[in-house]
Amino acid sequence: MNRLPSSASALACSAHALNLIEKRTLDHEEMKALNREVIEYFKEHVNPGFLEYRKSVTAGGDYGAVEWQAGSLNTLVDTQGQEFIDCLGGFGIFNVGHRNPVVVSAVQNQLAKQPLHSQELLDPLRAMLAKTLAALTPGKLKYSFFCNSGTESVEAALKLAKAYQSPRGKFTFIATSGAFHGKSLGALSATAKSTFRKPFMQLLPGFRHVPFGNIEAMRTALNECKKTGDDVAAVILEPIQGEGGVILPPPGYLTAVRKLCDEFGALMILDEVQTGMGRTGKMFACEHENVQPDILCLAKALGGGVMPIGATIATEEVFSVLFDNPFLHTTTFGGNPLACAAALATINVLLEQNLPAQADQKGDMLLDGFRQLAREYPDLVQEARGKGMLMAIEFVDNEIGYNFASEMFRQRVLVAGTLNNAKTIRIEPPLTLTIEQCELVIKAARKALAAMRVSVEEA
């Protein structure tokens, strides 16, 4: 039977939600009721699949905990009042922590002035953020297009490369195996996970994938494309593959790819949606090799964990294809005043507090601890790897990784797997994580592994 629209029901539901938003605390009964509501509404109106996915972060084995608020810069609190050290970081958005006061203040101040721009008049913060990014990014990167997410940033990069290279007869893109660039149609064409690709085949034509980190495979692909007349418009890759399992390429790989792009006249697109904004110990991961891309993609942490914003930054030579008609690629909410305020404040915090250097130092501390655990538990842990505060623990099979996430949840530490590698648990905390919290995370991991070994032995 078709359900008739109900204004009364919609009004009641929205009023109830607004009442919850206004509340600072909930009593025990309110918390229980909220848990029931959230689980029901996810099942009936969002997607029941998310409930099964979130079983690993549930102490009782039912469904995922219901998040209520940020506890501190580096912790989350659920509706039961339990505080968790955040080692997931919202998949890399909380580089400056949760509700960083500088970022929140900037957004609140802008909200009091003008939340969204008129679309017709010039908006100051978009101009100032573009200028700031031109100063912050490496090489000749100069012009910025702003959007709302990482996949939009990649879409813009692909379209920009097409617009620049099409008059030159170059239409092919080379991406890498294990890559994740987003799930919109163009970005998904560059992504290399069959689970995400197969339901939407055929994707955009002209994309090839080569093994990540293998420079000879890259050279061979570029040569073959040239021989067959399928000249390459651009190579797109992540400096470190995040969703692929935090896969680091061999030293010098990015430098060698840059040289190949120059040799074959291909643009180099670096997707730093996850690795950028100080995550790996430098402001941008490409700076570890002093590599300068033609197009750089940012998002996630750019908004400081407060506002969604993405950016596609390109050299003047490449970006100039949009000068004659700036409406070739636009978005209504991209570069809005609230998002730009958040991004400007985020950059300020990263630089003022030297958070990239802190990520380098604390990342080394965490990684040393995880590698020691890998030596102590070789029957469970295959490898610990990473750079800065982007790390991964790879287990000997998928089930162990799932159990580790569950055990860490019991220890009040939030972690999760990577999208393209089920055996790998990602460690991606805020860069503001304290030394004491780093020590607590290592202790929690040791307790989790010890409990898992006992379970395996008893089985």
Curated annotation (Swiss-Prot):
Keywords: Aminotransferase, Pyridoxal phosphate, Transferase. One of its GO terms (molecular function) is pyridoxal phosphate binding. GO terms for biological process: L-lysine catabolic process; putrescine catabolic process. The keyword Transferase applies. Transmembrane segments: none annotated. It catalyses: an alkane-alpha,omega-diamine + 2-oxoglutarate = an omega-aminoaldehyde + L-glutamate; putrescine + 2-oxoglutarate = 1-pyrroline + L-glutamate + H2O; cadaverine + 2-oxoglutarate = 5-aminopentanal + L-glutamate. SUPFAM superfamilies: PLP-dependent transferases. Pyridoxal 5'-phosphate binds at residues 150-151, 274, 332. The modification N6-(pyridoxal phosphate)lysine is found at residue 300. Gene3D superfamilies: Aspartate Aminotransferase, domain 1, Type I PLP-dependent aspartate aminotransferase-like (Major domain). It holds the Pfam family Aminotran_3. InterPro entries: Aminotrans_3, Aminotrans_3_PPA_site, Class-III_PLP-dep_AT, Putrescine_aminotransferase, PyrdxlP-dep_Trfase, PyrdxlP-dep_Trfase_major, PyrdxlP-dep_Trfase_small. Its EC number is 2.6.1.82, 2.6.1.29. Its cofactor is pyridoxal 5'-phosphate. Pathway: Amine and polyamine degradation; putrescine degradation; 4-aminobutanal from putrescine (transaminase route): step 1/1. The keyword Transferase applies. Catalyzes the aminotransferase reaction from putrescine to 2-oxoglutarate, leading to glutamate and 4-aminobutanal, which spontaneously cyclizes to form 1-pyrroline. This is the first step in one of two pathways for putrescine degradation, where putrescine is converted into 4-aminobutanoate (gamma-aminobutyrate or GABA) via 4-aminobutanal. Also functions as a cadaverine transaminase in a a L-lysine degradation pathway to succinate that proceeds via cadaverine, glutarate and L-2-hydroxyglutarate. Belongs to the class-III pyridoxal-phosphate-dependent aminotransferase family. Putrescine aminotransferase subfamily. This is Putrescine aminotransferase. It comes from Shigella sonnei (strain Ss046).
